[in-house]
Amino acid sequence: MVFRIASSPYTHNQRQTSRIMLLVLIAALPGIAAQTWFFGWGTLFQIVLAAITALVAEAIVLRLRKQSVASHLQDYSALLTGLLLAVSIPPLAPWWMVVLGTGFAIIIAKQLYGGLGQNPFNPAMIGYVVLLISFPVQMTSWLPPYEIAATTPDMLDTLRMIFTGHTASGGDMTLLRIGIDGISQATPLDTFKTSLRAGHSVEQIMQYPIYSGALAGVGWQWVNLAWLVGGVFLLWQKAIRWHIPVSFLLTLALCAALGWLFSPATLASPQLHLLSGATMLGAFFILTDPVTASTTNRGRLIFGALAGVLVWLIRSFGGYPDGVAFAVLLANITVPLIDYYTRPRVYGHRKG
């Protein structure tokens, strides 16, 4: 009688990487639709630019490394990296910025480390942070949602803005950022932080048009809820586990609630933190990256909680209005340590 000895792992998941990546791309559709609805065609154009750049950059590096281009491109990881970066930057950012950021994400943050599965940091967030540090003005120049915008560019004007910086009538970014109150608009988090520094009270800030009739900023709450819908879809499909998004959101909400309770005149409310900025995008689509996140269940809870604390600290006391990207990268640094101390005991062995 012949006995076959198989090596671990003894349980297998039949889902391939390409299928998981495709599920994430599908889950991103509600968020993309919401951002396009509130901020215009620029979101779609940036996604197309980022996707093309990601595929070309990946193909070039794979060819230089003498690896199969077709098989690697078919895992959709490059497309997902480009998409996550594209939806994180302002919709009318110059074309060369998304090309530069995506190229850096693919070539430096991913392929330089050996490709998919080898990178210690989330490539899309590396690209985003490089752009934010290098071009802070352009990276914080978000359009006001169409509901409070004085001027809304059409599809052709959006293309002109991205590639030339001007509309057909000669308008520029400064003009397009003006709201119905005649004041240049920013994101709810940016407006909150800037206004506090200018000496305005929270009560005064909440009267601004960007917060009018909204829990966390006109348009932005619906964008976050749309990303939440996509996240629930990923949980339903078991493409991601619940530990990271739940621990992240609960920790962020708890920190925000405690801060708001003790200092309501200087700190943002929990709903502003949860439904503004890149909160839901980060919780379900960025932090859950299986390559750069913790691999144990306890580790995932710690990883998500750490990111939640960091986001709140950066938003409340840091120099940037939204801290999701920095929090993700800082949490990525701790993953080896978290995994070391949370790895499960080998069956049949006692702790030494």
Swiss-Prot record:
Signal peptide: none annotated. GO terms for cellular component: plasma membrane. GO terms for biological process: electron transport chain; transmembrane transport. Its cofactor is FMN. Its main location: membrane. Belongs to the NqrB/RnfD family. This is Ion-translocating oxidoreductase complex subunit D.
